[in-house]
């Protein structure tokens, strides 16, 4: 009898969870996906190895800190290798609903360059990833529509509200129902032709957070690709606000140099 009651309770909970998932709107699904992909923990650090299909590589460290009380975030990227990008650093102040502030320090010129909002969808250090991929795209920049629901994933179409500001007509994202992590995004041009794809190749649970540890960006039109591998991932390490300032572009903190 007890077993029957327990089975009934488990079944009821499962049905309730399924019903709750079925009731999610496209906007809610995308918001959960954004939270899973960019807001794990209050802050974090990772070592990143980037491999381009032409044989080039990039090694860097990325730091992230959430601004308390909202969705604003700060990102700091410090390049360690190869020689042509060593000591280069990149800073983002992400402000959903507004243009992000982005700076790039070029050590060869001893120059801090402000990256214009219109350049956020350009190549990130010569790779197939874009500057916007580092910190994410604003939820309010697109209209979201649930195109399909499978047994394991939501498929959402995202259409830009300002088409003139981007190179795509729309993009489609596959989102895992359990983790809400995006597994794949495909970008289509005005002719409906696929020209770009970004996918999560490997996912591990780190400190309780499902985390992509390998991602791939493909320029389908040009036939090139870039793979990034994340290691030494740590969350909630007490990063200080002072790190995420223009001053530390020229003077990298020990959190990225060690």
Roles of regions detected by a PLM:
Residues 1-4:
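Positively charged n-region of N-terminal signal peptides that target proteins for export
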Residues 15-23:
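Sec/Tat signal peptide C-region and signal peptidase I cleavage site
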Residues 30-32, 46, 60-62, 140-145, ...:
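Short structured motifs
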Residues 49, 56-63, 67-69, 94-96, ...:
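Ribonuclease/tRNase effector modules and their secretory precursors
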Residues 80, 91, 101-105, 111-117, ...:
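Gly/Pro-enriched, hydrophobic low-complexity segments
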Residues 24-108:
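N-terminal mature ectodomain segment of secretory-pathway/periplasmic proteins
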Residues 7-16:
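Bacterial N-terminal signal peptides
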Residues 245-258:
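Short, low-complexity, Pro/Ser/Thr/Gly-rich segments in the mature regions of secreted, periplasmic
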């Amino acid at each position: 009898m007890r077993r029957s009651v327990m089975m009934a309770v488990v079944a009821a909970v499962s049905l309730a969870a399924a019903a709750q998932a079925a009731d999610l709107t496209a906007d809610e699904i995308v918001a959960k996906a954004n939270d899973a992909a960019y807001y794990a923990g209050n802050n974090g650090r990772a070592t990143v190895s980037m491999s381009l299909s032409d044989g080039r590589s990039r090694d860097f460290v990325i730091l992230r800190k959430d601004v308390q009380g909202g969705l604003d975030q700060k990102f700091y990227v410090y390049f360690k290798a190869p020689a042509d990008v060593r000591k280069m650093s990149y800073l983002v102040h992400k402000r959903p609903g507004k243009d992000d502030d982005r700076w790039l320090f070029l050590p060869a010129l001893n120059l801090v360059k402000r990256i214009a909002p219109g350049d956020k969808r350009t190549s990130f250090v010569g790779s197939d990833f874009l500057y916007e991929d580092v910190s994410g795209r604003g939820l309010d920049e697109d209209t979201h529509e649930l195109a399909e629901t499978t047994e394991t994933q939501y498929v959402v179409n995202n259409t830009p509200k300002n088409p003139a500001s981007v190179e795509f007509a729309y993009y489609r994202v596959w989102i895992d129902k359990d983790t809400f992590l995006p597994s794949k995004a495909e970008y289509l041009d005005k002719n409906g032709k696929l020209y770009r794809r970004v996918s999560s190749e490997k996912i591990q649970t780190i400190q309780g957070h499902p985390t992509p540890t390998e991602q791939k960006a493909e320029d389908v039109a040009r036939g090139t690709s870039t793979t990034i591998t994340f290691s030494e991932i740590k969350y909630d390490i007490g990063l200080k606000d002072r790190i995420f300032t223009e001053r530390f572009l020229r003077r990298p903190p020990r959190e990225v140099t060690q």
